[in-house]
Design a protein with these regions (language model features):
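Amphipathic terminal alpha-helices
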Residues: 170-185
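Conserved donor sugar-nucleotide recognition element shared by glycan-biosynthetic enzymes
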Residues: 22-26, 53, 79, 116, ...
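Catalytic helix-loop patch of NAD(P)-dependent Rossmann-fold dehydrogenases
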Residues: 1-43, 48
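A hydrophobic C-terminal alpha-helical subdomain
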Residues: 140-162
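Mid/C-terminal beta-alpha module of Rossmann-like enzyme folds, strongest
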Residues: 89, 96-146
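NAD(P)-dependent short-chain dehydrogenase/reductase
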Residues: 31-78, 84-92
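A general structural signal for well-ordered alpha-helical segments in protein cores
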Residues: 56-58, 83, 87, 116-120, ...
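Residue-level signal for the nucleotide or nucleotide-sugar donor/cofactor binding architecture
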Residues: 20, 78-81, 114, 154, ...
Length: 185
């Protein structure tokens, strides 16, 4: 829901400025939920991946196994976030009954920051896909239908303070996800 022009992680109070239809529909959903007056927790997240379905991690595993060379965008910064970490956080909040009286918007991503390029290099290294050469490129060199924010870091102070969450680092979670993928294959 943000435009990506910030230089510090976005707080929940930062003014939204979606760059594409996806961001606009996410913001519209938040606004519709808030307008109902219901007691809701709205969680914003970014750069989700898991061992299921299509996502960046699984795409990089496939490409680095199949190709000798790929280019990956290096000028977009965010936090790779394992969907299992988000699910566990939501489960602990709901199961513990910690949400009563704490309605509102919260940010949740794993800890740390990377570019898509850095994340791709880490995925390939951890998976042993050393034969694929990964090179950085600019967003402008990799056109997509939807404009993407250059900076997607979310400030997690509020969710940590409100719910006492311990948030894992993205690298630990990536390794865990890769282990689960390997085990399931």
């Amino acid at each position: 829901v943000f435009d990506g022009h910030a230089s510090t992680p976005y707080t929940e109070e930062a003014t939204p400025g979606p760059l594409n239809a996806y961001g606009r529909t996410k913001l519209a959903g938040e606004e519709e939920i808030a307008a109902t007056g219901c007691h809701a927790l709205i969680f914003r997240t970014a750069w989700l991946y898991s061992e299921f379905s299509g996502n960046f991690l699984k795409t990089m595993l496939r490409l680095t196994a199949e190709k000798e060379h790929i280019n990956v965008v290096a000028d977009q910064i965010g936090t790779p976030t394992y969907a299992g970490d988000l699910a566990l956080a939501l489960f602990s909040i709901i199961e513990g009954g910690y949400y009563a009286g704490r309605e509102g918007i919260y940010h949740f991503t794993d800890e740390g920051a990377r570019s898509w390029y850095d994340f791709a290099v880490e995925i390939a290294r951890a998976a042993g896909h050393d034969t694929c050469r990964i090179e950085p490129c600019r967003t402008a060199d990799y056109p997509t239908r939807a404009q993407r924010p250059a900076y997607s870091l979310l400030d997690k102070s509020k969710v940590r303070r409100t719910f006492g969450l311990e948030i894992p680092h993205w690298r630990e979670s990536m390794l865990y996800c890769l282990m689960r993928l390997k085990k399931n294959n």
